[in-house]
């Protein structure tokens, strides 16, 4: 998947028709979607329409993000997939659910995702 993502920035895939509408939901993205949907965090059925859920978030983000601050023409489904993975990591830290690969220091002065 990472190879395909990298090839997207070459002549081979720069004109791919599904750049904005497809991304592979990895384990972190699936857990992030599960958190948002209130599903069991371990739910990971491959036949589930993960891409449809990510596309819905992509559409919502395009409606709500300020185009004067973010170049939305470069905002792809890959950003949604990566954002969901990061959301899951930060949620695990906040909820003290196991360990993460990297160490993050919590700062109570920074806003939580719920406050943004």
Task: Give the ranges of each region predicted by the language model.
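C-terminal accessory module of base-excision DNA glycosylases/AP lyases that mediates lesion recognition
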Residues: 4-116
């Amino acid at each position: 998947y990472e190879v395909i993502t990298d090839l997207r920035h070459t002549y081979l895939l720069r004109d791919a028709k599904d750049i904005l509408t497809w991304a592979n939901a990895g384990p972190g993205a699936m857990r992030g979607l599960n958190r948002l949907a209130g599903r069991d965090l371990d739910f990971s059925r491959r036949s589930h329409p993960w891409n449809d859920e990510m596309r819905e978030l992509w559409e919502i983000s395009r409606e709500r993000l300020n185009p004067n601050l973010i170049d939305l023409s470069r905002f792809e489904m890959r950003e949604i997939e990566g954002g969901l993975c990061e959301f899951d990591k930060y949620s695990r830290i906040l909820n003290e659910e196991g360990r993460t690969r990297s160490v993050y220091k919590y700062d109570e002065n920074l806003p939580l995702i719920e406050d943004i």
